[in-house]
UniProtKB/Swiss-Prot annotation:
Its main location: cytoplasm. Its cofactor is FAD. This is UDP-N-acetylenolpyruvoylglucosamine reductase. It comes from the Bacteria. Keywords: Cell cycle, Cell division, Cell shape, Cell wall biogenesis/degradation, Cytoplasm, FAD, Flavoprotein, NADP, Oxidoreductase, Peptidoglycan synthesis. GO terms for cellular component: cytosol. Disulfide bonds: none annotated. Pathway: Cell wall biogenesis; peptidoglycan biosynthesis. The active site is at 176, 226 (proton donor), 296. Its EC number is 1.3.1.98. Cell wall formation. Belongs to the MurB family. Residues 33-197 form the FAD-binding PCMH-type domain.
Amino acid sequence: MINKDIYQALQQLIPNEKIKVDEPLKRYTYTKTGGNADFYITPTKNEEVQAVVKYAYQNEIPVTYLGNGSNIIIREGGIRGIVISLLSLDHIDVSDDAIIAGSGAAIIDVSRVARDYALTGLEFACGIPGSIGGAVYMNAGAYGGEVKDCIDYALCVNEQGSLIKLTTKELELDYRNSIIQKEHLVVLEAAFTLAPGKMTEIQAKMDDLTERRESKQPLEYPSCGSVFQRPPGHFAGKLIQDSNLQGHRIGGVEVSTKHAGFMVNVDNGTATDYENLIHYVQKTVKEKFGIELNREVRIIGEHPKES
């Protein structure tokens, strides 16, 4: 049963049309899985995020943040408390050699804006399906580039609802890691310092990376992107492939036959299917090679109640 006090309090903080109750989250994830959120809100201003976070902190209400749901699995039991979608914080502004983008802006779009202004440095992101907030959260990268190579600062909100501006060094960006994760912060916007380049050369590089991505990744099915982090000295996909796991299926989810590092939803798969397949792959690779595969994809939410 939804708490009316929380609903009424949220109505005082943000417009009513930005509040959804008992909202199905599978609408907002690339895997097309997930239960319902007690409250799902879509702020369009930084101040609205701050106000809701501050209220939630003062009243001990859990808060979960969502970008575009590309590298996340939400369990069928859903998420209690307040889910804040950051997708409407999607501004992209250019000033000289810098780009400032809102948390909800797609990093693909930001890389395209950089190209349009003949700014080089974000070509690596032309095929990453995440939002800016998610990209900073996990220091997203591809094809030899990553967020930490070009980010200047990130404007964040802490658990108490206060604004914090963090420099590149303060963000502690590492392989798929950052201070954002450790301190439970949320990114509102990020600034990137780029370099002047030639638009034709930037476009050529983006075309090459796009072709490589499309030829190797199973983009025809819903998926959560790259499932595992790269183990030191190895490639997760190669270990999975050498374990003869490509095509292995649990429920409606299977290890992609096109790229072993991906798991695709081929037949109405559930978050439970994903989670079980992830555990099976981890167990098999550990037994065969003695190597632990750590998840890159986030798994959140409550397990479904047994009927």
